[in-house]
């Protein structure tokens, strides 16, 4: 069984959903990013979604765009991201690690090299947010050859053909988005329509569904699971906490780890009070 399969099986047995925080590697520097990861795991994170900083993050809203910029300003590279994954994997051998990486990176490094080096570092899955499933065939082939689960986004207003492709080719989990657009708490999830979003994806079977985009409160998490999702992913709300605990020079304040742990703990608790 893969780490994702073990996780979702264990959570289902306990009647819990998954809470997965998104954390930008190298933001504001590798050591602080690792401290944020540790704090999130201490708060009960079931898996991680880790971002690799990129200069043109088209799927992200202002908060996570700023995180990309901070990390790049500090000298972030793909190689440093890979080294951070190794460190995280060594500390947390059983934790599923998903990557969110823009499609220019695998093109630059070569598909086979890209997937194999992330797999060797300890990543379980890779989501390329700017690569739709209709363009995914070469990425899926390279990912599966390397032993990486390819992840695709199921847009809120996707066609049946798109959803069928997402269900067919996503392994590990399916990233369903609660509303179309970019990431961010500026536009919170349309919780009243979550049942429809989840059911549209579920019709085609496939991997467990994690709901993302605009998930910023424990109630959003509970609503996602009540709608039938296997869990929820939060990025911008956590990134705002990081941003609020950095000084003008980008140095972390003493309370950063405690704030991250507290936030994740509350979000994780919401996975235990809703029936999927």
Swiss-Prot record:
Pathway: Amino-acid biosynthesis; L-tryptophan biosynthesis; L-tryptophan from chorismate: step 5/5. Its EC number is 4.2.1.20. This is Tryptophan synthase alpha chain. One of its GO terms (cellular component) is cytosol. Keywords: Amino-acid biosynthesis, Aromatic amino acid biosynthesis, Lyase, Tryptophan biosynthesis. Tetramer of two alpha and two beta chains. It catalyses: (1S,2R)-1-C-(indol-3-yl)glycerol 3-phosphate + L-serine = D-glyceraldehyde 3-phosphate + L-tryptophan + H2O. The active site is at 49 (proton acceptor), 60 (proton acceptor).
């Amino acid at each position: 069984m893969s780490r994702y399969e073990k996780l979702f099986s264990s959570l289902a047995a306990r009647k819990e959903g998954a809470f997965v925080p998104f954390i930008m590697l190298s933001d504001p520097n590798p050591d602080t990013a690792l401290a944020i990861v540790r704090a999130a795991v201490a708060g009960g994170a079931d898996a991680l979604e880790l971002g690799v900083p990129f200069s043109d993050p088209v799927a992200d809203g202002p908060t996570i765009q700023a995180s990309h910029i901070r990390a790049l300003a500090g000298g972030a590279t793909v190689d440093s991201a890979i080294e951070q994954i190794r460190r995280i994997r060594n500390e947390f051998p059983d934790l599923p690690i998903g990557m969110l990486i823009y499609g220019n990176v695998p093109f630059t490094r070569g598909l086979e090299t890209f997937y194999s080096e992330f797999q060797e570092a300890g990543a379980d899955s890779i989501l390329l947010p700017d690569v739709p499933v209709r363009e995914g065939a070469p990425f899926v082939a390279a990912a599966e050859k390397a032993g990486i689960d390819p992840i695709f986004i199921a847009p809120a207003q996707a066609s049946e053909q798109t959803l069928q492709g997402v269900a067919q080719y996503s392994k590990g989990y399916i990233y369903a988005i609660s509303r179309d657009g970019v990431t961010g708490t500026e536009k919170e999830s349309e919780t009243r329509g979550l049942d429809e979003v989840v059911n549209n994806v579920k019709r085609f079977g496939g991997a467990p569904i994690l709901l993302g985009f605009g998930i910023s409160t424990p109630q959003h998490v509970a609503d996602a699971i009540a709608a039938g999702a296997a869990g929820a992913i939060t990025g911008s709300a956590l990134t705002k906490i990081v941003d609020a605990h950095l000084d003008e020079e980008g140095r972390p304040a003493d309370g950063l780890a405690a704030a991250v742990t507290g936030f994740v703990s509350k979000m994780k608790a919401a996975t235990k009070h809703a029936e999927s």
